[in-house]
Amino acid sequence: MAHKKAGGSSRNGRDSEGRRLGVKKYGGENVIPGNILVRQRGTKMWPGVGVGMGKDHTLFALEEGRVAFTMRRNRQYVNVEVAAAQ
């Protein structure tokens, strides 16, 4: 008869850290070129007017303006609306 307690728990108890994905600038917020708008895996959201997409699908501002989210043909787009010069 074995005199050992169950020893499986030492192999458990680890997990990877969260990736900090999601929207970084919300609708109506002012942004400048280079600001990160959305960090994502794959194209959950698509770049619209005034927005670029990095190789890891990060969306970032190309122009100064205000963030706006729109839906078109079952795709969510992120736009930067440039304020009219005054």
From Swiss-Prot:
Keywords: Ribonucleoprotein, Ribosomal protein. Belongs to the bacterial ribosomal protein bL27 family. Disulfide bonds: none annotated. NCBIfam families: L27 (TIGR00062). InterPro entries: Ribosomal_bL27, Ribosomal_bL27_CS. GO terms for molecular function: structural constituent of ribosome. It comes from Magnetococcus marinus (strain ATCC BAA-1437 / JCM 17883 / MC-1). The gene is rpmA. This is Large ribosomal subunit protein bL27. GO terms for cellular component: cytosolic large ribosomal subunit. HAMAP family: Ribosomal_bL27.
